[in-house]
Design a protein with these regions (language model features):
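Nucleotide-activated donor-binding/catalytic signature segment of Leloir-type glycosyltransferases, i.e.
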Residues: 257-275
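Short hydrophobic beta-strand element within catalytic cores of glycosyltransferases
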Residues: 312-315
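Short alpha-helical donor nucleotide-sugar binding micro-motif in glycosyltransferases
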Residues: 100-101, 274-275, 282-287
């Protein structure tokens, strides 16, 4: 545990706003939960982040803890004009950095975040306690933005504090430590025990219910929901009954809606839009299988959420898939190359009731170590040990 007097400042690009209730809020409820549980280890916490105007279409969560906020400009994008805008806002960020430097003695820099590049140089040469995280794919990949690679290079070779990243194992030589991205508390795990037991009993009894699939993520090419739609179309053409919930929103929503309508799938595949955390939990409870076909992924939080609810994941093979599946104990990996092959694999696998029950039990046991409490405790313990050595 960090000493009680430690005051934490978090620098992030997570967009916030003030809700109609006059309370700081964000659409990224996972970020909110993680920062609130981390803040419990400190006497006071500041979050330095962009603020925008509130709009009625936002699906948001309000903060409940006593966290102080410093607003910064909301900028970003990949166009040259976007980069120039970012450069123009650096003085405003530096002004905020100067303020929080006087108020906190421990600083948490979250990457990837272009505006944390000046944050890196500003704080890395102070005598303050520092730690950072990189919430993206750590290994380089084709098409990766050059600024992402630059940030990883800085963190690995020059950052003076511990860095938490999605790794298969710790790399103390480079002060890199593996982490994960939790959504739920231990209490949530306990709450789902009865519902999960019913799922397992149903498998043991050989019940032939309609399989229910779920996939969660932004509707874009990287998340690759089109591959899932193609595979489910094949199941439909083979007269296999099922339901599938696609949760999210994004630029490909209309394309997906047209595909569903054009292939007579409107009674089987449902576009759910963005959901509040509790509404998503209700869908997980109804679901049997999770399909994530993301082409690039860090430590996907969605499969872990599935484990809590007894949902068995099918994950496209990416850098961390083997770790997330606990070496295949908790789910199944596939190559998102040919929807015909995947559809056949899916049809064969979901019939193996005993195997599926084993996967649910393994996922539940695995997820016990992936709670918000475990995540925050590991960070605090690692930071303390790092600076006391």
């Amino acid at each position: 545990m960090m000493k009680a007097f430690k005051k934490l400042a978090i620098i992030s690009d997570c967009v916030h706003f003030i809700s109609p209730n006059g309370i700081a809020a964000t659409e990224n409820h996972i970020f909110l939960r993680q920062m609130e549980v981390l803040a419990k280890h400190f006497s006071h916490t500041i979050i330095c982040c962009p603020f925008v105007e509130f709009s009625d279409n936002k699906i948001y969560t309000e903060y409940t803890g006593a966290i102080e906020f410093y607003a910064t400009p909301n900028v970003g994008g990949n166009k040259v004009s976007d980069k120039l805008t970012i450069l123009k806002t650096i003085p405003a960020w530096l002004k905020v950095f100067k303020k929080i430097k006087r108020q906190a003695d421990c600083f948490y820099l979250r990457f990837p975040d272009n505006l944390n590049i000046p944050g890196f140089f500003y704080f890395n040469f102070t005598k303050k306690i520092l730690f950072a995280s990189y919430a993206g794919t750590w290994k380089n990949y084709p098409g990766e933005p050059s600024t992402y690679r630059f940030q990883k290079y800085l963190l690995k070779h020059f950052f003076k504090g511990p860095v938490f990243a999605y790794l298969e194992k710790d790399e103390p030589k480079y002060h890199l430590y593996k982490t994960f991205s939790p959504s739920y508390f231990q209490e949530t795990w306990e709450e789902e025990s009865e519902n999960v037991a019913l799922k397992i009993n149903g498998l043991h009894e050989g019940k032939k219910d309609i399989p229910v699939f779920i996939s969660v993520g932004a509707f874009n090419a990287q998340k690759n929901q089109q591959f899932i739609l193609e595979a489910l179309k094949i199941l439909h053409e083979k007269d296999i009954d099922f339901k599938c919930y696609l949760v999210g929103d994004g630029p490909l929503k209309q394309q997906y809606a047209a595909f569903i309508a054009g292939n007579s799938l409107t009674g089987k595949i449902f576009l759910m839009g963005k959901l509040k955390a509790n509404d998503l939990r209700m869908l997980y409870r109804k679901s049997d299988f999770l399909i994530q076909a993301s082409l690039i992924e860090g430590y996907g939080k969605v499969p872990v959420e599935g484990y809590f609810h007894g949902v068995i994941p099918f994950l496209h093979k990416t850098q961390m898939t083997n770790v997330i599946l606990d070496n295949g104990k908790c789910g199944f990996a596939f190559e998102a190359n040919d929807p015909v092959i995947f559809a056949q694999f899916l049809m064969e696998t979901i019939q193996q009731k005993s195997l599926l029950a084993e996967k649910i039990i393994a996922g539940r046991n695995f997820s016990k170590g992936l709670t918000l409490e475990k995540w925050s405790a590991r960070i605090v313990e690692t930071v303390q040990n790092f600076y006391e050595r």
